[in-house]
From Swiss-Prot:
Tissue distribution of the protein: Expressed in the whole plant.
UniProt region (Disordered), positions on chain: 1-40, 141-186, 286-320
InterPro entries named among the record's database cross-references: MRS2-like
Membrane topology: Multi-pass membrane protein
Protein's UniProt name: Magnesium transporter MRS2-3
Residue positions of motif Required for magnesium transport activity: 437-439
Similarity comment: family membership: Belongs to the CorA metal ion transporter (MIT) (TC 1.A.35.5) family.
Transmembrane annotation, as ranges: 416-436, 455-475
Compartments in which it is found: Membrane
Compositionally biased residues, Polar residues: 10-24
Record-level Gene Ontology MF annotations: magnesium ion transmembrane transporter activity
UniProt xrefs under CDD domains: Mrs2_Mfm1p-like (cd12823)
Organism the protein comes from: Arabidopsis thaliana
Amino acid sequence: MRGARPDEFNFSTNPSTPNTGQPTPTYPAGVGGGGGGRKKGVGVRTWLVLNSSGQSEPKEEGKHSIMRRTGLPARDLRILDPLLSYPSTVLGRERAIVINLEHIKAIITAQEVLLLNSKDPSVSPFIDELQRRILCHHHATKPQEEQNSGGEPHTRVDPAQGEAGTEQSSGDQGSEAKKDAKQSLENQDGSKVLPFEFVALEACLEAASSSLEHEALRLELEAHPALDKLTSKISTLNLERVRQIKSRLVAITGRVQKVRDELEHLLDDDEDMAEMYLTEKLAQKLEDSSNSSMNESDTFEVDLPQGDEDDRLPPEFASEANRDGRYLQANDAHELLMSTQSALSRNSRGTHTSSTRSAMTNKLDVEELEMLLEAYFVQIDGILNKLSTLREYVDDTEDYINIMLDDKQNHLLQMGVMLTTATLVMSAFIAVAGVFGMNITIELFTDNKHGPSRFIWTVIGGSIGSICLYVGAIGWCKYKRLLE
């Protein structure tokens, strides 16, 4: 047999020792290799954890720890990364809901809420409001939980009822977890209480919509005076203010539009809304686990030996079995087969009933979530309509300013035409003076008696002729509607 090469079993952790063909072992921060002076691991951030009773606790968790805790993939956690620019997103997963709305970056599970940027000053009011809502939800569901868990008598089986009573008690215990989960969602007065994840989701949606609405209102209050001032006086300062307002308007309109599109996408897809029922899915898992344990117990009862089967018989049948043991042995195979068939049929009926009830409940729950999302969809749509109205007002102001500038430009062009016409007439008069200024001998220059008077009449006649030419040119332009 060929021997192994020396470097195949080289597992040395010394960095100076080469280890070809094997991956270099890596150590976390502070473990080995002088890691005591290194920073904490990459991806470790401070999360504020709010449990179902309203208590908050900051924890430093890494990416992999959050993935194990919430069951989310790495790409979903990347959405919450503050260093990356992701649009507003609401994702429903198997065990958690990912919320990335404006300044709110959170992960909602069936029992807790994890906030990423809890130290942000803009998030502090949201944390207080979320704690208040969670406390109200906890106080609303706590009496029912105490009533369901405390002082409830256990179901006793009458020995005279035999196996039927045992099967009935097992079936009741199979759906006990789901009944408790359903009863915990009802208030003392019988009114419906939203699940924990919907309470947190509603708080996130309300905080995001309120933030957008306040920003839109503040922008509207700043925009109207600036636009009115620009209308009355066009200046560089007013134009700069309107330009900044328009840039902010475009930015906030895009953000509101993204939130609206996200809510509309959720409302159009019932499967995505069904994924957000974390409490329902958790109760369903508990029911499935109880059903599986019940199935195992039924299978175990079917496979019991002959002595145990005799012990499980009711009293009136036990006496008959003692009197006629041979009859019981002859029908042992038949009874075993019938008990197996009854167990299988009972399990199939329970599974069918559970699935039917779950489907009907999911339909009602999706309708309930749809009503919740529609309320905030209408609010976001109203904010978008306000921004659209403000955008139209800005566009109308721009059109009005352009009309004013065009009117001023037309006046400047008319003035240019009038000045050009006057210059042309003056050029004609100067041409007459130039003709008389030529150095030639004529009779007018040699007449000493009538020379000055003729000069005066020539100047007066040239001026009157120039004025007549100017008036005629302006009249022709107005006739052709070149001038107003």
